[in-house]
Structures are given as C-alpha cells and as structure tokens.
Amino acid sequence: MPTEYFEQRERALLGQRYEQLYAAPQQTAERGVTVSALRTTPEQFAQRADFPLEPSPFCKAAFVVHQPDFKPGRHPYHHAGVFYSQEPSASSAAPLLGVQPGMRVLDLCAAPGGKSSQLAAALQGRGVLVSNEYVAARAEILKSNLERMGVSNAVVLNETPARIAEALPEFFDRVLVDAPCSGEGMFRKEPVALQQHCEALVKQCAELGAQILDCAAAALAPGGQLVYSTCTFAPEEDEGQVAAFLQRHPEFALADVLGNVDYTFGSVGEENRTGGLPLDVSKVRRIWPCQGGEGHFMARLVKAGTPRTLPPEGEYTPEEQLWLAAAAEAGKKGKAKPAKVADARSARRADSRACRDAVQGTSRRTRDTGAGEATPAQSLAAWQEFARQYFPALVQRPAVVHGGGVLLPVAFPQTGLHVLRAGVFVGSVQKGRFVPEHHLFTAFGSLCTNCEPLTLA
C-alpha cells in the first residue's frame, strides 16, 4: 500500500481518476528487456528468444517479458550483451534524445547503465558517450555493464555534475538527466522505496534534481537537447521541476518530448502539477502504473543556438584528432608507470570483486592486476603483434598503456575528472605474450578475422 502522504496528495490532485491510474500497484511489477542494436535487431531477437515476450509500447527495442520465473541475468543473451534487463517504462527516456552517430552524449546519472546502453546503441560506436555516476560503488557496476554490452566509445566517470559542467562547458550535443528521485514509480518493484518514502524525501530530491539540471544546462552545447526524466509522480520533481527550470534558464525552450520518435505512449502532463508556473503540459509525458509500466515522467528541452556540425563517418574533428594524438604519444613515451600485467582470469575476478564490493557498499577503484611487470613499450608492441594476427582493423587505432594493460582510448580531452574507463581495455602482457581481455571481444568481436564463429540459434 502507498504511504499516507502519497495517497492524500495524489487523491487531491487526481480526484476520481486516482483509482483508475493507480489500479495496478497491487499487481506484480512489470518486467522487460531492451535489445542492443550493437548486437541484433528487435525483429531478429523476437524470432530467436526462447521465452515469452511482447513488444513494449515505450521503446521499439524493448519487450515485456511474460514469464514470472524468468531470470534474465542467467540467460546467455544477457552475458553476450544482447539485451539489458530493464523495467518497461524505464526504456522510454533514452530514445527521446534523438541521438545520432558522431554526437557527444552525456548520461549524467547513469548507473546501473540501462539508459547508457541504449544511448551507446544509437551512437553505433561513433562519437563519445560519457556515462557518469556519483556513487563510487555504483560507478563500478556501470563500468562493468557497459563492458558487457560491448560499448567501445564510452568514458565512465565517477564525478559530481558540478565538476563535469565546470570541466566541459557547452561540450555535449545531448544530455540525459535521469534524476535521482523519490522513486514513487518503484513501489511495486522495490519495497525499500516504499519504506523510505516521505514528504521530506520528495523535497530533498526536488532540490537535488534542480541542481543537477543546472549543471546539465551548463554542459550542453548551443542547439543541443536535454531530456529530463524521473521514475516518480511527485509534482515538485516532474512538471514543477521543468517549469521552474525554464524560469531560471530563458535560453531553453520546452519541445515536444515525442518529437524525435515516430510513436506515442503514456499520457500528457498534468496542469495542476506545475506549482503555478507556466508550462505547456501537452509537450511532456507521463507513464502511469495502469499503462503497462512502473511509472515515468519525461520532458525534452532545447538550448538556443546552432547545433554543432557532426564529422562524416570515419572522420574526426581537428580537436578530436589532437586528443587522440596526445593519448597515443603518451602511450609511446611511456608516461604511465610500468604496467603490472594480468591474465584474463585475474581481470574477471577483479571485476567480480568490484561488483561484490559494490553490493556490500564498498569500492575498488583499481584492478588487482596480478603478478609480473611489462614496460609500456613492451605492452604496446605485444598488442600490435596480436592485433595484426586477429584484429587487423584495429592496428591503426591509437593505443595507450593504462591501468595494468593496453587501452584503445576514446577521443576525449584531458580534464582532470575521475575517469574509471575511457575506451576499451583490450588486454595485457603476461610472461612475454599478449593476453586479450573480455572487453576486446564484447566491443570488437565482429572484427576478429582468425576465430571460430559460435551461435546460440
């Protein structure tokens, strides 16, 4: 049952519609998966899936799963990065940004990574996706999930929104703010959300959301687009939040939230939830529990100015070329400390420990890289030899020695921000030979020219 505060507030706002819109909370929480375009198409997935599902109304790549005992984390497709287990309405926000390959995209509150994986699929390996999480333990889980999903162009940060906005002003073409919220849409799925819910929490989350939105506005380039979303129904965090933002930021305009997609879902916003401030609620979107999801709110905001021209496919802008050249030169000169080597097994164990520590509330920011050492020059030479044999398409990619192994970096400036991963960790040297890392195959497996194909069909 919802809290007394929640029920009183919503009955006052909705009147007789309360019973209709909140008819579903007594039922079992909806379950779903979102398919990655980096792996397959929704049509191919639907044909091959060995569990009952139906297309989700909230996202063309998402499906509702109708099997109560289904364990998505145990399915081979999960481990292969084919899908991300995601509550159906949670998949709705990312497509609304209209991300195109080559863009610079920021997911400001990204953990555990479901929406970031959708944004990465839209980028198709071009441009850069900056996925940030403030809580260190959750940032480790975010990094692990993006590796599993085969994302090759992500920069994973463990930072505050304010530091990102200061370091990268007007840098991003698209920004997603899936804000930390009071979680009223999670009452069925997460009992702890119901236990912690109170009026003070709503006010606290509204204040935090406003601060994050201001940082997002500073990081967004002229002509860029920002999507704000929550999984709550509180007016202060939804329509009221957006209306107040527009008062503070006259350089922004509210756009039709569905303007970048060719489908519709949910309901329009509510006039009596704007806090008395002007807002065209027909341009924002709500998903109520009775509509097939747990609950979501979304708005799209456009910053005044001319959008950045995207580079042609396969090309970098002059400044991106400088960033990559600087990273490559740093690797050649061995500016990093001599790298401790690790085999693939020890790397996987380190990732497992990081996930375990995250669950227990602690954090490991570095890998246990195992025994032995190799110089940066030795590591790079071993990678080049391995790449020529198995991944010739990657031979010309800039490579640097970092964190105990070889990294294929993303075109991204040196900012002083706390970076957990910026590119693909392809492997390391052990006893004189190159040992590939799992991330190499999740990100670039299709480029391998000397391997045996496997299929789950």
Regions found by a protein language model. Name each.
Residues 103-104, 128, 174, 223-226, ...:
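Short glycine-centered segments of the SAM/dcSAM-binding site in methyltransferase folds
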Residues 137, 174-215, 227, 231-239, ...:
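Mobile active-site "lid"/loop adjacent to the S-adenosyl-L-methionine
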Residues 1-171, 203-208, 255-281, 285-287, ...:
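Glycine-rich nucleotide cofactor-binding entry segment
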Residues 124, 220-222:
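Helix-to-beta-strand junctions that scaffold the AdoMet/dcAdoMet cofactor pocket
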Residues 1-13, 17-48, 294-297, 304-457:
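Polybasic, low-complexity RNA-engagement segments
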